[in-house]
From Swiss-Prot:
Sequence segments annotated as region (CPSF4-binding): 180-215
Name of the protein described by the UniProt record: Non-structural protein 1
Motif Nuclear export signal: chain residues: 137-146
Organism: Influenza A virus (strain A/Turkey/Ireland/1378/1983 H5N8)
Keywords carried by this UniProt record: Eukaryotic host gene expression shutoff by virus, Host cytoplasm, Host gene expression shutoff by virus, Host mRNA suppression by virus, Host nucleus, Host-virus interaction, Inhibition of host innate immune response by virus, Inhibition of host interferon signaling pathway by virus, Inhibition of host PKR by virus, Inhibition of host pre-mRNA processing by virus, Inhibition of host RIG-I by virus, Inhibition of host RLR pathway by virus, Interferon antiviral system evasion, RNA-binding, Ubl conjugation, Viral immunoevasion
Amino acid sequence: MDSNTVSSFQVDCFLWHVRKRFADQELGDAPFLDRLRRDQKSLRGRGSTLGLDIETATRAGKQIVERILEEEPDEALEMTIASVPAPRYLTDMTLEEMSRDWFMLMPKQKVAGSLCIRMDQAIMDKNITLKANLSVISDRLETLILLRAFTEEGTIVGEISPLPSLPGHTDEDVKNAIGVLIGGLEWNDNTIRVSETLQRFAWRSSNENGRPPLPPKQKRKMARTIESEV
């Protein structure tokens, strides 16, 4: 196993522990708590894949971080922070909408790269809105946190989420996954609307890169883009 993979996991475990202590003092905002919850799932998946114990990795990560901080002057730390672009966290969904459990009458699941696509094929003739929470850097998609499909009644009927055991995805991965979700939902004559946030950062207009957003074999009846509700 690559030593960098192990040490990266150890540092991530310790930094998650620090963030958890911060949240336990009720100091974190909603985006912070949401990332904390999702990163916990990711760490569990990575730990299982690597065969590493999280508690042991956390202790090792603490030693690595302490050693770095001892060697790092404050001036260098300030310069590093200033030179790194800060991501923006954009939200279509509330924390309740993101954490709500949902069930499928006719479940369908597909894995595309490091993204898992789930939808309920029992849904027919509905107006459906795609909403997402994501982070962007320099006006480009950095990470899709979660995408969900909602009916007008607020029922969740579809979802795209990163696989905890396979971190990392590109904006093209997200775009392709959205195409699969839309194609599956449109198959039952549902009408799909896309939030302004998704339209801008993950589901850009057709012909932008010389091809339509949906694969040729999928239906093309995208409804008008709606403005973000948040």
